[in-house]
UniProtKB/Swiss-Prot annotation:
Species of origin: Mycobacterium ulcerans (strain Agy99)
Listed CDD domains: GT20_TPS (cd03788)
Pathway this chain belongs to: Glycan biosynthesis; trehalose biosynthesis
Role of this protein: Probably involved in the osmoprotection via the biosynthesis of trehalose and in the production of glycogen and alpha-glucan via the TreS-Pep2 branch involved in the biosynthesis of maltose-1-phosphate (M1P). Catalyzes the transfer of glucose from UDP-glucose (UDP-Glc) to D-glucose 6-phosphate (Glc-6-P) to form trehalose-6-phosphate. Probably also able to use ADP-Glc, CDP-Glc, GDP-Glc and TDP-Glc as glucosyl donors.
Full protein name: Trehalose-6-phosphate synthase
Reaction(s) this enzyme catalyzes, per UniProt: ADP-alpha-D-glucose + D-glucose 6-phosphate = alpha,alpha-trehalose 6-phosphate + ADP + H(+); CDP-alpha-D-glucose + D-glucose 6-phosphate = alpha,alpha-trehalose 6-phosphate + CDP + H(+); GDP-alpha-D-glucose + D-glucose 6-phosphate = alpha,alpha-trehalose 6-phosphate + GDP + H(+); TDP-alpha-D-glucose + D-glucose 6-phosphate = 5-methyl-UDP + alpha,alpha-trehalose 6-phosphate + H(+)
Length: 500
């Protein structure tokens, strides 16, 4: 145990070397384990922009992916052999039911997630959750140390694994280690609430390069490195994919940068042009009664996404007659998320109550004004909805980036449609020709939606053309290359301070 009864985040050193020159470490593997009726195990590929961007590099550099397979195991101390799936080497890390409850649902998603999203919901602080977070991070670090070749490169992903860089540095000081945070990094005064604030910052400082979506997150991290660890840091501003900050820790220099993540925009653009997608988009409009305007929301069912905000705005616009109920519909596609967490159960009940109230007030029999689906939607069906809709509503209270906004833009080769976008998304810094709104200002959201609905064709095409230029030029491949190029320039120094 560490000081004050805390579980120590210090791992034991290891001298075991693997054969993978490049290792990605993430909470989940890019495959899901399935048990077939005959009892055998099968692996199903999970779609995702990250694996799409990194797959060529993983193949070229004898790469491996370390992560959880998505199934609960009883014996977590068993070291599974690597799996080869579609020529990719995958190294599973086992999690028990208690691990999932305490490390994932607990510390990751009931402590860190709300804290990093501006405390929209109050974070819960439990020492038992922290201890389990330390333990699981150690297991990920150990699996990575076994997989990585001598002098290899490791890229650790996201908030669930913030202790892995320091642990891995202690085990394998020969490695080049990068870390990227896919969610917002909070303001200093909010982060300081965390009882284990110093341990998290120290964990991240085990990396050679720490990446965030936006310069603001990088600046917050530099301040916290000075305040909590006593490190010397650069004082200038951090730029996007340039002008890196630096943290000096012993004889090590850690670079800190901003790398806005993106999507496989070229592939989406091509798919959205497909004849079958276009036909399906017309069918969707017909199934909705051929309304004059379709508003669309696509989100995980999460309290950060502001689904309630757009429903309130739509209700007020209907009440004030600024939107006509006989020619405008709102479609909300809400993917189930973290259904065992109480705050998410409450959110679902609240959203469904709102939908029922709006339809009860404004719908006609057989013609609801809000169409709500609480289930996953197949990828091509989602693309057809993007093509069919007139206004995309993206109204999070806080979001690290929001890739749905970029996906919508990538699908609109016709230059149709409009994007209403929260100022509190990372995407707002890049999609400046969206209708930007403050989700905390309901009247402002109402005005933004009304303006988007009533834009002229010329203005809409001009806005969409500008946003598409940005999204198509800055795709997920460019994001990955920019991070990894910066990481290659951040080779670790050989020193006795490597694990400081």
């Amino acid at each position: 145990m560490g000081p004050g009864g805390r579980q120590s985040a210090e791992p034991a050193s290891t001298e075991v070397f693997g054969d993978s020159d490049f290792v990605v470490v993430a909470n989940r593997l890019p495959v899901d384990q399935e048990r077939l009726p005959d009892g055998t195990i099968a692996w199903k590929r999970s779609p995702g922009g990250l694996v799409t961007a990194l797959e060529p590099l993983l193949r070229r550099r004898r790469g491996a992916w370390v992560g959880w397979a998505g199934v609960v195991e009883n014996d977590v101390d068993v070291q599974d052999e690597p799996i080869v799936q579609d020529e990719l080497q995958l190294q599973p890390v086992r999690l028990s039911a208690d691990d999932v409850a305490q490390y994932y649902e607990g510390f990751s998603n009931a402590t860190l997630w709300p804290l990093y999203h501006d405390v929209i919901v109050r974070p819960i602080y439990h020492r038992e959750w922290w201890d389990r977070y330390v333990d699981v991070n150690r297991r990920f670090a150990e699996a990575t140390a076994r997989a990585a070749a001598r002098g290899g490169t490791v890229w650790v992903q996201d908030y669930q694994l913030q202790l892995v860089p320091k642990m891995l540095r202690a085990m394998r000081p020969d490695l080049t280690i990068g870390f990227f945070l896919h969610i917002p990094f909070p303001p200093v005064e909010l982060f300081m609430q965390l009882p284990w604030r110093t341990e998290i910052i120290q964990g991240l400082l085990g990396a050679d390069l720490v990446g965030f979506h936006l310069p603001g997150g990088a600046q917050n991290f530099l301040i916290l490195s000075r305040r909590l660890v006593g490190a010397d840091t650069s004082r200038g501003t951090v730029g996007v994919r340039s002008r890196f900050g630096e943290v000096i820790l012993g004889s090590r220099t850690i670079r800190v940068g901003a790398f806005p993540i993106s999507i496989d925009s070229g592939a989406l653009d091509q798919t959205a042009r497909d004849r079958n997608i276009r036909r399906r988009s017309r069918e969707i409009r017909a199934e909705l009664g051929n309304p004059r305007k379709i508003l669309l929301g696509v989100d995980r069912l999460d309290y950060t996404k502001g689904i309630d905000v757009r429903l309130k705005a739509f209700s007020e616009l209907l009440a004030e007659g600024r939107v006509k109920r006989d020619d405008t519909v709102l479609v909300q596609l809400a993917t189930p998320s973290r259904e065992r967490v109480e705050s998410y159960q409450t959110l679902r009940n609240d959203i469904e109550r709102q939908v029922g109230h709006i339809n009860g007030e404004y719908a006609e029999v057989g013609h609801p004004v809000v169409h709500y689906l609480h289930r996953p939607v197949p990828r091509n069906e989602l693309i057809a909805f993007f093509v069919a809709s007139d206004v995309m509503l993206v109204t999070p209270l806080r979001d690290g980036m929001n890739l749905v906004a970029k996906e919508y833009v990538a699908c609109r080769s016709d230059l149709g449609g409009a994007l209403v976008l929260s100022e509190f998304t990372g995407a707002a810094a890049e999609l400046r020709h969206a209708y930007l709104v403050n989700p905390h200002d309901l009247e402002g959201v109402n005005d933004g939606i009304e303006e988007a609905l009533n834009q002229t064709e010329e203005a809409g095409r001009r806005r969409m053309r500008s946003m598409r230029r940005q999204v198509l030029a800055h795709d997920v491949d460019r994001w990955a290359r920019s991070f990894l190029d910066a990481l290659a320039d951040s080779r670790p120094n050989d020193s006795a301070d490597a694990a400081d």
